């Protein structure tokens, strides 16, 4: 698409960044001065009843700056990148039709990628094939199935841990159904996003600062009642650690503590470590991201001004 035809497309803003970088605070400030509506791009914030451990915006913040695609699933339900793309496109169309600009804010980079580039033509899940894989796993163990994936698709096997049955099963299922590897298929993109997108990433200037922010926020969550929140989920009886919701960072570690598998101190240590690892993965995505403008989260006023310099003209 050439620059002229791109300029005729409706506008959108992406505000990306690692966890604890100040994305939400900046988005709320931007909404005060720009004709934008916020759409959450976060695979944890979609869940109801998971507020403290996901650092969900407070009731006051949401009143001042409503976020779409928040609290749209029960923790027992799945939500895919395809689900997100469908829902986000519908919300973006609605916002644009009202004469405003969609501002998509979050840290789930897979969702941003799916929205921007479209989805690979992966086959739909097949219960029969999935059942056969699970039966094999029960007989032989997931470790052996991971070795099988290494032979079929070494790139996917390097990315998927043997203790991640959901993703391991899906990679094998895709091959058994289509005859093509997950790596082959994910290199084929779908429909590109029909918007002129201005992309920003916010993060502290140093890794040490980000680590400090992560540790501080985890302790703030604990002080705000995170344990009670997870105990309420645990008490339901229908949730478990194979679900994406309970595998969210912080929740998985607190779950292990509640089950008596680890001590409280170990839970805190693992929770902070897991959050840092998540931030590292997010930063790896962002460093390879094309067309992104970087903002310093340690200087929020300057970050806001930089966005306004770029976006102010398109918002007039």
UniProtKB/Swiss-Prot annotation:
GO terms for molecular function: ATP binding; tRNA dimethylallyltransferase activity. Substrate binds at residues 19-24. The keyword Magnesium applies. InterPro entries: Dimethylallyltransferase, IPT, P-loop_NTPase. Keywords: ATP-binding, Magnesium, Nucleotide-binding, Transferase, tRNA processing. ATP binds at residues 17-24. The record marks 108, 130 as: Interaction with substrate tRNA. It catalyses: adenosine(37) in tRNA + dimethylallyl diphosphate = N(6)-dimethylallyladenosine(37) in tRNA + diphosphate. The keyword NAD does not apply. One of its GO terms (biological process) is tRNA modification. Its cofactor is Mg(2+). Residues 42-45, 166-170, 247-252 are annotated as: Interaction with substrate tRNA. Its EC number is 2.5.1.75. Gene3D superfamilies: 1.10.20.140, Crystal structure of tRNA isopentenylpyrophosphate transferase (bh2366) domain, P-loop containing nucleotide triphosphate hydrolases. Monomer. Belongs to the IPP transferase family. Catalyzes the transfer of a dimethylallyl group onto the adenine at position 37 in tRNAs that read codons beginning with uridine, leading to the formation of N6-(dimethylallyl)adenosine (i(6)A). This is tRNA dimethylallyltransferase. It comes from Salmonella arizonae (strain ATCC BAA-731 / CDC346-86 / RSK2980). The gene is miaA.
């Amino acid at each position: 698409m050439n620059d002229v035809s791109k300029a005729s497309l409706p506008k959108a803003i992406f505000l990306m960044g690692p966890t604890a970088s100040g994305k939400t605070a900046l988005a709320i400030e931007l909404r005060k001065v720009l004709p934008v509506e916020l759409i959450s791009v976060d695979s944890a914030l979609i869940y109801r009843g998971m507020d403290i451990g996901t650092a969900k915006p407070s009731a006051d913040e949401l009143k001042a700056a409503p976020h779409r695609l928040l609290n749209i699933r029960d923790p027992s339900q799945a939500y895919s990148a395809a689900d997100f793309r469908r829902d986000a496109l519908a919300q973006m169309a609605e916002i644009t039709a009202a004469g405003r600009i969609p501002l998509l804010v979050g840290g789930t980079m897979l969702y941003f990628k799916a929205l921007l580039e479209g989805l690979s033509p992966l086959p739909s899940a097949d219960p029969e094939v999935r059942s056969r894989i699970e039966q094999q796993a029960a007989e032989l163990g997931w470790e052996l199935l991971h070795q099988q994936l290494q032979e079929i698709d070494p790139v996917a096997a390097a990315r998927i841990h043997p203790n991640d049955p959901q993703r391991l099963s899906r990679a094998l299922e895709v091959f058994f159904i289509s005859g093509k590897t997950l790596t082959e298929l994910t290199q084929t993109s779908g429909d590109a996003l029909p918007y002129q997108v201005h992309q920003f990433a916010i993060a502290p200037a140093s890794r040490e600062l980000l680590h400090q922010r992560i540790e501080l926020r985890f302790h703030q969550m604990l002080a705000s009642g995170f344990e009670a929140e997870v105990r309420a989920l645990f008490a339901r009886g229908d949730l478990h650690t194979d679900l994406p919701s309970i595998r969210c960072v912080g929740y998985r570690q607190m779950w292990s503590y509640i089950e008596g598998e680890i001590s409280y101190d170990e839970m805190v240590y693992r929770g902070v470590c897991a959050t840092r690892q998540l931030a590292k993965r997010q930063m790896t995505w962002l460093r390879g991201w094309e067309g992104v403008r970087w903002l310093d989260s340690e200087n929020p006023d300057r970050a806001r001004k930089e966005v306004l310099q770029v976006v102010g003209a398109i918002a007039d």
